[in-house]
Amino acid sequence: NEGQVRSLKGSSVLIVGLGDIGREFGWRMKALGCTVTGVKRTPGGCPDYVDRLVLMDQIEEELPNADIVALCLPSTPETRHFFDQRRLALTRRDCVLVNVGRGVTVETPALCALLDQGHFGGLVLDVVDPEPLPMNNPLWGYRVILTPHVSGNYNQQSTYDTVIAMAVENLQRYLDKQPLKYRVDRKSGYRVSNNQE
């Protein structure tokens, strides 16, 4: 007996950050039959793949309710170590935590301390702090799925093709004197939303 097998269908998923990565993750989770709650920092419309939309100041009320918590945050002064010991401990003990945003949003020593206590039903990290993860980092000693954070390095042809297509599209928009897409507000560290373009 390998223990209980959990299904994605019917799972409650909390997606923290609804930028490009969060949107793609949410869309897939919804398609697999999950109930999706999205967390944003600013009010706005609720995407069709999100069942409920809450703001960041409500996150502590939402963390204990999720089967899966997906962190899709950028690295900003406000998000650095946002997931500290206190917030991580608010997740359910059997919660699956996924970080596909930036490693610095999670306080690694706090994460390890909770793992020592048997917290988390699963942990999937595409990003870590520090990155790359040194061989002597305690995270290597746990049952954690660590994936290489390679999407930005053109290690996959599809990533390279996407970046080239985005650059060509923006070059054409520039030549046509149209607003550029994929802009980032340097002050906030967040992408400028489409409705502001």
List each model region and its residues.
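Glycine-rich Rossmann-fold phosphate-binding loop(s) that bind the pyrophosphate
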Residues: 17-19
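N-terminal Rossmann-fold NAD(P) dinucleotide-binding loop
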Residues: 22-23
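Conserved acidic E/D residue at the C-terminus of a beta-strand in Rossmann-like folds
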Residues: 40
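Rossmann-like adenosine-cofactor binding region
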Residues: 43-137
